A protein has these predicted regions:
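Catalytic and substrate-binding clefts that recognize carbohydrates or anionic sugar/phosphate headgroups
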Residues: 1-216, 222-227, 235-240, 411, ...
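Catalytic core of carbohydrate-active enzymes
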Residues: 3-5, 12-13, 392-404, 410-423, ...
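Beta-sheet entry/capping signal
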Residues: 58-63, 148-149, 155-157, 188, ...
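Active-site-proximal helices and loops of the catalytic beta/alpha 8
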Residues: 72, 86, 252, 263-322, ...
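Short, solvent-exposed turn/loop segments enriched in Gly/Ser/Thr/Pro and often Arg
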Residues: 162, 223, 249-254, 285-292, ...
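Aromatic-lined carbohydrate-binding/catalytic grooves of carbohydrate-active enzymes
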Residues: 213-374, 415
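Extracellular glycoside hydrolase catalytic/binding regions
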Residues: 420-440
């Protein structure tokens, strides 16, 4: 049915039949907007109203609506779409945070905020021959942070500018056209001119908003202690052994269940202890409230502050990993509910925390109802933006720039409210489904979507059906993490087959020297990273840059998916294969210096010394 979707059609789907505009019957001006009334190939005579309006230099919005004729088309139109011509060799980048690839050419990419994808781990050898792209829960395109946006290598970008579930068909069913579709009876999209991918991205990031200016200490190394009874032991050890670390991550769950209650004095003493040692410290929140968090749940339920079910009652969700934890979700479309939730944040702010993990946001049920009348299908993708922006507006007033709040969920518009994005809960493996390789794709795709301050769970989080992170994987992930927007390690996680004791940690003997080396290097790079951050604030160019943003006319550079520029001058090619002791990479045009052969590291002092540099010629592959 989609063969009629050529590279210049716009139309709607009714009961699996597509109808598209055929010719312009009328046109008129409404202010700056051009409004077209187009005839369609629908035999019942329905027409389409198409509105084009400039929003900024090089930015044009397009809205398409059905004008009813004599039949049921307007009532039953369920999908609207538009087609574009595909040029030979054109590539499609962006789409928010994506694990499976940075370049989605030839694929279908949907936008729906959800958990995943999770790697099949130890079951991979069994599943891969049968299901080549098998990943939990809904396949390789699953993501916590979809953005229905693409920047193409032809030098322009397109945003599906509505919250409904949408899909890009990227030359996946015909090589001369690509199209976009929204699961709604109308279509809103915005086009951003180039002429280069970097220029189109700049326009998009001006339109969507850029991440708030970070505090300098965000860019230092982060670590998570695991010694609950001895909270300062690792922090003191790192200071003693000359390992520079800026942030300590702790996870008292202020929400959903109010785990801080009865521990307030202990919390304050721990915070003071880390602060006195020169560390910043974070904790944990999510947008849910446990049904047994008496005073908080009772007030919120009585005042209508939760997302409701079809009967008008608080929608109660169950945690799939904790059977006895039942929660309801704050309704951020209600300003009073947002203010109630902000008061809960004050418990951690008043205790002295410097930030927190702001978890979840992807669970709004499709059959729920919000205070503003939105149904779950429309609210689902909007919810994480409303959630994180409620937090940002409050912490901006209470804490200024010194609020290290890191989020995993989002949608278009999240950029202006997400101080830090982390890549969700990756699998503790090497895979491009959800492991280390996937993290490289994530940093590139988020950067191409207007996000600069991003970091992964170094070492991974999930080990559902696979072994825990070993020393080799931990070391390689550390190397990659040192060249991410945020360098943040993970020490815990979720495993069904083994315990935390089986997991490699950065302070273990085999990894500690590597941890020290890369924290020292990261700290030495602080002025360079902060300069790259200022470039992002001015121009929207991310810290980790897909080569298409820097070398748009070099076809071989544009094709790379597992190497990137870190800031303006460093080309990074992480080792992402188990057992590898070398890897090849493509050097784009220009002259290059091999840092590792030109920079000497002294283990005893932790100092780096510049040695003799040999220039390498670009436009070729090296090992």
């Amino acid at each position: 049915m989609n063969n009629a979707f050529l590279g210049y059609y716009i139309g709607v789907e009714v009961d699996t039949l597509w109808f598209h505009a055929t010719r312009v019957a009328e046109e008129r001006r409404e202010g700056r907007a051009l409004v077209l009334l187009a005839e369609t190939n629908d035999p019942l005579g329905h027409r389409m109203e198409i509105r084009l309006e400039p929003k900024a230099p090089g930015v044009i919005t397009t809205s398409a609506r059905v004008v009813p004729g004599s039949g049921p088309l307007a009532s039953f139109a369920r999908v609207a779409g538009a087609g574009f011509e595909a040029a030979p060799g054109e590539r499609y980048l962006g789409f928010g945070e994506r694990s499976n690839a940075a370049d989605q050419t030839g694929r279908e990419v949907f936008s729906w905020a959800e958990e995943g994808p999770f790697s099949s781990g130890a079951a991979d050898d069994l599943l891969r021959p049968l299901l080549p792209e098998f990943t939990f829960p809904t396949g390789p395109a699953a993501t916590n942070l979809p953005i229905p946006w693409t920047v193409t290598t032809r030098g322009f970008g397109v945003l599906i500018d509505q919250p409904h579930r949408s899909t890009f068909h990227l030359a996946s069913d015909r090589n001369d056209a690509w199209r976009l579709e929204a699961e709604a009876g109308h279509l809103d999209f915005t086009v951003f001119a180039g002429p280069t991918p970097a220029k189109a991205l700049r326009r998009y990031s001006e339109y969507a908003g850029r991440q708030p200016k970070p505090a300098p200490w965000f860019f230092g190394p982060w670590f998570q202690p695991t010694l609950e009874g001895r909270p300062f032991e690792l922090a003191d050890r790192f200071r003693k052994e000359d390992v520079p670390v800026s942030v300590v991550q702790t996870y008292t769950h202020y929400l959903p269940c109010g785990d801080h209650r009865g521990r307030e004095q202990q919390e304050r003493e721990r915070i003071r202890g880390y602060h006195s040692r020169g560390y910043r410290i974070t904790t944990y929140f999510n947008p849910h409230v446990c049904t047994d968090y008496g005073e908080a749940y009772g007030e919120a339920a009585a005042r209508g502050f939760f997302i409701r079910n079809m009967l008008g009652r608080p929608y109660v969700l169950s945690n799939p990993f904790t059977a006895d934890e039942r929660v309801s979700e704050i309704d951020f479309t209600n300003p009073e509910a947002a203010r109630f939730w902000q008061r809960l944040l004050d418990d951690a702010i008043d205790a002295g925390y410097d930030g927190w993990m702001e978890d979840f946001g992807e669970y709004t049920p499709t059959d729920s109802v919000a205070a503003d009348g939105s149904g779950g299908l429309e609210l689902h993708n909007r919810y994480p933006v409303l959630y994180h922006c409620a937090s940002y507006e409050h912490t901006r007033k209470r804490m200024g720039r010194d609020a290290a709040i890191f989020v995993r969920s989002g949608f278009h518009g999240i950029q202006r409210c997400a101080r830090i994005v982390w890549g969700g809960d990756p699998t503790e493996d090497w895979s491009c489904a959800d492991g280390l390789c996937a993290a490289v794709h994530q940093t590139l795709s988020t950067g191409l979507s207007g996000i600069a301050y991003w970091g992964s769970d170094i070492g991974g989080f999930h080990a559902l059906v696979n072994p825990r992170t070993d020393d080799e994987l931990n070391a390689r992930w550390l190397e990659f993490g040192a060249f991410s927007g945020i360098m943040r390690t993970q020490a815990n996680g979720l495993s069904l087959l083994s315990s935390r004791a089986d997991r490699s940690q950065v302070w273990h003997p085999a990894v500690m020297p590597i941890w020290r080396r890369y924290t020292k290097l990261r700290t030495r790079l602080a002025p360079y990273i902060q300069a790259a951050s200022r470039t992002y604030q001015r121009r929207g160019l991310p810290i980790t840059r897909h080569l298409a943003l820097v070398f748009p006319r070099d076809a071989r550079a544009v094709a790379q998916q597992e190497e990137f520029m870190f800031g303006p001058d460093l080309l990074v090619a992480p080792v992402i294969e188990k057992g590898a002791r070398e890897r090849s990479l493509y050097l784009p045009r220009g002259r290059w210096v091999d840092v590792w052969r030109s920079l000497a590291y002294r283990e005893r002092s932790g100092a780096f010394r510049l040695g003799r540099a040999t220039l390498l010629r670009g436009r070729r592959e090296v090992t």
